[in-house]
């Protein structure tokens, strides 16, 4: 059985976590949870200064990391990106939206807006898994919904405002992209994500980098009288975020780990540093896949390959499931493919916390496993 294969210790990565979310958390960040002063935060009120100072640090850190233009704000709340699809449906789409769909997760927001009884029919532009479509300027569209990185397939797309769409908002699902891929904030109105990917924390929180136009849209929709449940009310989240707090109680460890990761990124050179680490890892993974006889990158167009989520197809003669099982038995975990894609492949998380040298060790470990199958 593949699980009986023993990979030599000298081949293994120093850290065997390659998941696409939850992802590797740096040991230094975990240590910060028990550092002097942490006990004044954990187990205390999120309405008081110790916790509010953490939220403030996160908001200021993300403003710096993404070089946000004047007027842009960092807004946060509970529920993760899944909640934000509903929040945006209720509070940012005025009537009609256009969605680019090229995988499981980019389809979720499209489904939410399509099912909303108070919105007009959305336009959905699809492409095959392993590719991404392009936005098209369209009359009557007030939100263009893009996805920076499709986590299920390992496809990334450049974020740029579609030409001829003045007055419409550009909303970007950056769940697995934020912090690991470069982006220009002037090209979006809302860039939303969760902290369990590049930001090496736990899930359950959403964060949104919002332009003045997006905030104004939220205020306009709220004033229109549209019924919005309080938990999904973006105006309430904005109001609380400006006070460095969330509407309801957040997971404090999640906030603290997020804060540690943002500080680490900024201290080492900001987004250029963080995205550079992921790019280095991706270069090693795809370079190995292209030169290895039994593997090929799933995304055939190099320009569309993700630097944070790598999907690698295996020759039909090799069962990628068996490879993943052998890796897991050796402490190298979460390399399994996205379940609904149905491909004979591995999916590798290459977020900034992952040491690029560990990607080399991972590929050496895969080669060893395949040689023993």
Please report, for each region that a protein language model flagged, where it lies by residue.
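Conserved active-site segment immediately N-terminal to the catalytic lysine
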Residues: 185-196, 206
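Conserved PLP-binding catalytic core of the aspartate aminotransferase-like
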Residues: 296-326
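PLP-dependent aminotransferase-like
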Residues: 82-142
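Active-site C-terminal subdomain of aminotransferase-like
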Residues: 24, 196-286
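N-terminal "arm"/small-domain region of PLP-dependent enzymes with the aminotransferase-like
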Residues: 1-45
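Active-site phosphate-binding strand-loop segment of PLP-dependent enzymes
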Residues: 125-179, 190
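PLP-dependent enzyme catalytic core of the Aspartate aminotransferase-like
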Residues: 15, 340, 344-373
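Conserved N-terminal alpha-helix of the aminotransferase class I/II PLP-enzyme fold
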Residues: 37-87, 108, 112
């Amino acid at each position: 059985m593949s699980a009986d294969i023993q990979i030599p210790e000298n081949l293994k990565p120093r850290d065997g976590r390659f998941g696409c979310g939850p992802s590797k958390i740096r040991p230094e960040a975990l240590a910060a949870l028990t550092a002097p002063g942490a006990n004044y935060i954990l187990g205390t009120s999120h309405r008081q200064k110790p916790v509010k100072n953490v939220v403030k640090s996160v908001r200021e850190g993300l403003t710096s990391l993404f070089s946000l233009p004047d007027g842009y704000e960092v807004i946060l709340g509970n529920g993760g990106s899944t909640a934000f699809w509903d929040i945006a449906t209720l509070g940012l789409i005025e009537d009609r939206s256009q969605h680019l769909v090229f995988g499981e997760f980019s389809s979720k927001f499209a489904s939410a807006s399509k099912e909303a009884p108070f919105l007009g029919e959305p336009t959905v532009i699809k492409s095959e898994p392993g590719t991404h479509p392009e936005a098209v300027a369209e009359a009557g569209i007030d939100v263009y919904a893009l996805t920076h990185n499709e986590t299920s397939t390992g496809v990334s797309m450049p974020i740029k405002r579609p030409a001829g769409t003045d007055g419409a908002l550009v909303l970007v699902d950056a769940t697995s992209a934020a912090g690991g891929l470069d982006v220009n904030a002037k090209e979006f109105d809302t860039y939303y994500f969760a902290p369990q990917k590049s930001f090496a924390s736990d899930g359950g929180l959403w964060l949104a980098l919002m332009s003045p136009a997006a905030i104004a849209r939220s205020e306009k929709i709220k004033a229109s009288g549209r019924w919005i449940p309080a938990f999904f009310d973006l105006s309430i989240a904005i109001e609380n975020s400006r006070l460095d707090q969330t509407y309801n109680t957040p997971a404090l460890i999640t906030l603290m780990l997020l804060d540690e990761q943002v500080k680490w990124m900024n201290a080492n050179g900001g987004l250029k540093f963080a995205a550079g680490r992921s790019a280095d890892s991706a270069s090693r993974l795809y370079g190995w896949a292209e030169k290895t006889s039994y593997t090929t990158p799933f995304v055939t167009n190099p320009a569309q390959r993700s630097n944070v989520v790598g999907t690698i197809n295996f020759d039909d003669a090799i069962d990628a499931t068996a490879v993943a099982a052998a890796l897991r038995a050796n402490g190298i975990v979460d390399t399994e493919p996205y379940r609904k894609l149905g491909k004979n492949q591995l999916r590798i998380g290459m977020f900034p916390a992952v040491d690029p040298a560990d990607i080399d060790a991972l590929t050496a470990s895969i080669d060893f496993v395949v040689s023993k199958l």
